[in-house]
Amino acid sequence: MAATTANPEMTSDVPPLGPAIASGNPGPGIQGGGAIVQRAIKRRPGLDFDDDGEGNSKFLRCDDDQMSNDKERFARSDDEQSSADKERLARENHSEIERRRRNKMTAYITELSDMVPTCSALARKPDKLTILRMAVSHMKSLRGTGNTSTDGTYKPSFLTDQELKHLILEAADGFLFIVSCETGRVVYVSDSVTPVLNQPQSEWFGSTLYDQVHPDDVDKLREQLSTSENALTGRILDLKTGTVKKEGQQSSMRMCMGSRRSFICRMRCGNSSVDSVSMNRLSFVRNRCRNGLGSAKDGEPHFVVVHCTGYIKAWPPAGVSLPDDDPEAGQGSKFCLVAIGRLQVTSSPNCTDMSNVCQPTEFISRHNIEGIFTFVDHRCVATVGYQPQELLGKNIVEFCHPEDQQLLRDSFQQVVKLKGQVLSVMFRFRSKNREWLWVRTSSFTFQNPYSDEIEYIICTNTNVKNSSQEPRPSLSNTIQRPQLGPTANLSLEMGSGQLAPRQQQQQTELDVVPGRDGLTSCNHSQVSVQPVTTTGPEHSKPLEKSESLFAQDRDPRFSEIYSNISTDQSKGISSSTVPATQQLFSQGNTFPPTPRPAENFRNSGLAPPVTIVQPSTSAGQMLAQISRHSNPTQGAAPAWTPSTRPGFSAQQVVTEATAKTRSSQFGVGSFQTPSSFSPMSLPGASTASPGAAAYPSLTNRGSNFAPETGQTAGQFQTRTAEGVGVWPQWQGQQSHHRSSSNEQHVQQPSAQQPGQPEVFQEMLSMLGDQSNSYNNEEFPDLTMFPSFSE
């Protein structure tokens, strides 16, 4: 204050700095010198010598404020730097964490891709979403809930658990069993183990699966039941990378719960009785064929090969508690194998006694309307021995027995008329080894649905049994036919008017049969004897044809026939008793006694006529076809040997004009009886003369059948036979035969049409006397014909 008073200029010129600085509002006078003041503050020249406490205190107070601001500024910059470092470090840590997370997820996805079979099978690695989707599908397939509800309790509403189980086991043809993986104890086995392994359920309950398998398969079974890591895991080759690594992941996957098990082992087969009704046919066949490992020795168990397929499951299942007395209850959650066992039939040989179980061997064939094979099943090799190409293009009649050919033809014609209906016929089929097999053929036609035309005939041919085992003899064995070579059997389809000369010769040889009873049907003009020609010039033509056909130089057998002809056969008849325009033949040899018993023939030749009831259609047609063998074309003379030449006591001579007016079945100058002759007259005609034995029985029919016009000149003349052998029962009838020899015999017209062949008299004779009742014991060789009893 003293200084201020002493220096007034300074006091007025220089305002005090303290209030100005303190107030912060400088006056107008010092506005222009703000910079100076600032420089003065920087230099602080006047402050050094100012000892005033107030002023000094003011200057010191200003310096402290500036230093504190610098400290704050420096502290703030340090904080900002530290926060930036923290943020940078935080960002780096987050990136590292994300990178690690992505790496882990990639590793897990890769591992999942290796575990899912559908992913590992792809050529290129799929994306993550595809891997996850395939993994879900694979898990659903393992659980078996792909098309069911999420709780896994779905089952068909119309089936109970037992019905569903039986259907599954029947379809699989095996048995279901559940085995504990730790101990091998059998938890459950189905009742179908009995037909498969021949063992009851009681033998499996309470035992272990190790007791049921072969001792050599125990280690394999223990490996399949194991759910832990195997210490001796091998090494596997990764085909993708080409590297060899340990079996780690695959082993873990194989041992995880729900993994599949499929193995083959040998199981013990029991000896309990098998009820064939309670199981299907396939199980019964397998039961008979289960000796695939060879026959077991006495006292040793018998084993069969069983294929087991199943899954490893948790036992007990979730939500199921075992009873306290169960030995598995105190061991916690365990695993079990649920599998189905089936017999491995491929290791079993073919059964040799399958004929008692299986159906007869059969094959399917297709034919056209004519019966020619157009398709043959491959099973024909096992049935008849032929390859399919050996049958294609050939007619089925060619492989049929000659006696059954017409029956087969009729069946084919009938099945065409039935149009879709099944027709069955049984005949003898010639196999490749030349044996006759009884074959039953069920045939039906296939029609085009648009044109309604028959496309083809489908036949199911079943081999019944071999005909060699049949006790039924053929006709060739009963009539003692001589062996004439393989060409003796002719086709039954050809008629008598269609035979070629060579076939006529074979036909004539076929008719050389001893012991024929129905000689009234024989063509007497065709007997190869020395001809006696009368004044009729026209009658020498058929004789010349006969001599040229059966000349001695044509066949060596004819020379023997001609040499054995007795001289009395050429003996002529005086023209006083016979018209001049007729040719005569005579023969004196007797017919040898037939091997048939005499009591089978009755004195029925003179009985009242009986109308024949024609047999059934098939039998009648067969007889009609066989009868064609006995009626060759006119002019062909059969060769009769002395031992087989029949004896006739009368000669029937018919004029040429009369023969021309007759129907085709009445040969020129022949003793041919129509097909409507009663078989009752046949036994008598076998030994007595035809004019004396058979024709008297026809005189009573004169009212019904008038003689044909033009036959007045052709009356039947009779002459006593020389050396004729007569059956004893007919000796008493000779007088009546001779008394009726001069009667005019009227030929009975045939009941059939002219184009229809006459019945083979041998067959009619075997039918026997209709006035008596015959049974099959008297005719054991004719099982194909029904017994005729009236």
Swiss-Prot record:
Chain residue numbers at which the record places covalent cross-link Glycyl lysine isopeptide (Lys-Gly) (interchain with G-Cter in SUMO2): 58
GO cellular component: a single term: nucleus
Entry keyword annotation includes Metal-binding: no
Domain PAC: 424-467
Start-end of Low complexity biased regions: 683-697
Region described as DNA-binding: spans on this chain: 88-128
InterPro entries for this protein: bHLH_dom, Circadian_TF, HLH_DNA-bd_sf, Nuc_translocat, PAC, PAS, PAS-like_dom_sf, PAS_fold
Start-end of Polar residues biased regions: 1-10, 465-490, 520-537, 661-679, 741-755
This protein's UniProt keywords: Acetylation, Activator, DNA-binding, Isopeptide bond, Nucleus, Phosphoprotein, Repeat, Transcription, Transcription regulation, Ubl conjugation
GO molecular function: DNA-binding transcription factor activity; DNA-binding transcription factor activity, RNA polymerase II-specific; protein heterodimerization activity; protein homodimerization activity; RNA polymerase II cis-regulatory region sequence-specific DNA binding; sequence-specific DNA binding; sequence-specific double-stranded DNA binding
Location of the protein in the cell: Nucleus
Residue ranges occupied by any PAS domain in the UniProt entry: 161-235, 349-419
Start and end residues of each bHLH domain: 89-142
The keyword Iron-sulfur is annotated on this UniProt entry: no
Region of interest: Required for heterodimer formation with EPAS1: 112-264
Positions with biased composition (Basic and acidic residues): 60-96
Region ranges (Mediates the transcription activity and dimerization of the AHR:ARNT complex): 167-171
Region feature Required for heterodimer formation with HIF1A, mapped onto this chain: 112-168
Matches recorded under SMART domains: HLH, PAC, PAS
Region (Disordered): 1-96, 465-492, 514-543, 661-716, 728-790
Function: Required for activity of the AHR. Upon ligand binding, AHR translocates into the nucleus, where it heterodimerizes with ARNT and induces transcription by binding to xenobiotic response elements (XRE). Not required for the ligand-binding subunit to translocate from the cytosol to the nucleus after ligand binding. The complex initiates transcription of genes involved in the regulation of a variety of biological processes, including angiogenesis, hematopoiesis, drug and lipid metabolism, cell motility and immune modulation.
NCBIfam families: sensory_box (TIGR00229)
Protein name, per record: Aryl hydrocarbon receptor nuclear translocator
Organism: Bos taurus
